């Protein structure tokens, strides 16, 4: 599972079904006990998304997505992230950056709200990720990254992600590549491949840096 949030929520929703039977969108369809999510990394955005990402025994990586999987509360406590190694901090931060960028340039359900949240997330990640990597005990940087991850998660839950995540999930499932690292490698390649189709939105993001 993508995070400790995903497993108990999915199991509470449909304890008598296999995880594979819940693959896809709106397969849980059952209310679960409201719960609070307390992230210890700034990356997945699980504290505000509908998705539980699963890698099965065949190395196939897929999502179980349902509105009931969204936590009722998110507690963003920077002290819980201070012991995170610099490498994991960087990789999870770049996962959040990819969420924000793909949400911003996507055309699925892109709104003024999702674009605003994505812009805020991108600006914060560029400013505070190097600081958190250099000094993991910097609580201001940790808090800003947690908030950015939350905003990026909120944005992509509405606007969706794109081809970067599609490829990153495949690499992660087949070769156990950390998700944030796969995103970091693929994001610039995919943005270049998009060419003029993404230039206007990417220029808008560049203006916030």
Show where each model-derived region lies.
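Glycine/threonine-rich beta-strand-loop-alpha-helix active-site module
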Residues: 1-79
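Buried hydrophobic packing segments
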Residues: 4-11, 100-101, 125-128, 149-153, ...
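Alpha-helix C-terminal capping segments
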Residues: 8-14, 29, 156-160, 170-175, ...
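Glycine-rich phosphate/pyrophosphate-binding beta-alpha loops
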Residues: 43, 150-183
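Carboxylate- and glycine-rich phosphate/diphosphate-binding segment that chelates Mg2+/Mn2+
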Residues: 51-159
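A general structural signal for well-ordered alpha-helical segments in protein cores
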Residues: 94, 122, 164, 183-184, ...
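Gly/Pro-rich interdomain helix-loop hinge
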Residues: 174-209
């Amino acid at each position: 599972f993508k995070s400790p949030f995903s497993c108990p929520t999915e199991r509470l929703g449909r304890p008598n079904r296999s995880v594979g039977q819940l693959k896809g969108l709106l397969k849980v369809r059952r209310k679960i006990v409201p719960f609070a999510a307390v992230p210890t990394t700034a990356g997945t955005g699980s504290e505000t998304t509908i998705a539980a990402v699963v890698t099965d025994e065949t190395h196939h990586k897929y999502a179980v997505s349902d509105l009931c999987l969204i936590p009722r509360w998110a507690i963003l406590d920077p002290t819980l992230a201070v012991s995170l190694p610099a490498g994991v901090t960087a990789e999870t931060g770049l996962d959040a950056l990819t969420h924000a960028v793909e949400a911003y340039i996507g055309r699925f359900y892109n709104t003024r709200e999702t674009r605003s949240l994505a812009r805020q997330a991108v600006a914060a990640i560029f400013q505070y990720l190097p600081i958190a990597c250099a000094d993991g005990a910097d609580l201001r940087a940790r808090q800003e990254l947690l908030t950015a991850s939350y905003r990026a998660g909120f944005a992509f839950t509405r606007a969706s992600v794109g081809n970067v995540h599609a490829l990153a999930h495949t690499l992660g499932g087949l070769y156990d590549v950390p998700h944030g690292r796969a995103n970091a490698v693929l994001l610039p390649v995919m943005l270049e491949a998009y060419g003029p189709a993404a230039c206007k939105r990417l220029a808008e993001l560049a203006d916030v840096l």
